[in-house]
Design a protein with these regions (language model features):
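Iron-sulfur-associated redox domains of electron-transfer enzymes in respiratory
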Residues: 1-123
Length: 123
């Protein structure tokens, strides 16, 4: 599941995603709500035919980052232990794998501030 702008903004990175999976669905969370996406993806998962989901987006987009938050909401709705979930951002047409811990941390500004204060100007 990719941000719909990925193909235009990072075409070689998008091609790398296509080499990983032949089933690619795109969504623009600027046009559709995250809740709509969660409902649709949740319905797809309930078929029990999906064993792996990849979320991929451009980096630094306030809309695309929401794509990566979908997994947390899905976990609240259902057991995803039998589904492999991967997250990538594409920077300079390269896939950068992002852990679910980093995604969760990105929603916690207080904790990010604490980390920044610990490391100082190193980041």
């Amino acid at each position: 599941i990719v941000g719909s702008c990925l193909d235009n903004m990072q075409p070689q990175g998008f091609d790398k995603i296509k080499s990983i999976s032949k089933n690619i669905y795109d969504i623009c969370l600027e046009q559709k709500t995250q809740n709509m996406a969660i409902t649709k993806i949740g319905g797809m998962l309930r078929t029990n035919k999906i064993k792996r989901i990849i979320f991929a987006s451009v980096d630094k987009s306030p809309h695309c980052i929401q794509l990566h938050y979908i997994q947390d909401e899905l976990r609240k709705m259902m057991n995803l232990s039998n589904i492999e979930i991967e997250n990538y951002v594409v920077v300079n047409n390269e896939l950068i794998k992002i852990s679910s811990e980093v995604i969760s941390l990105s929603k916690n500004l207080k904790e990010l501030t604490n980390l920044k204060n610990k490391v100082g100007d190193k980041i």
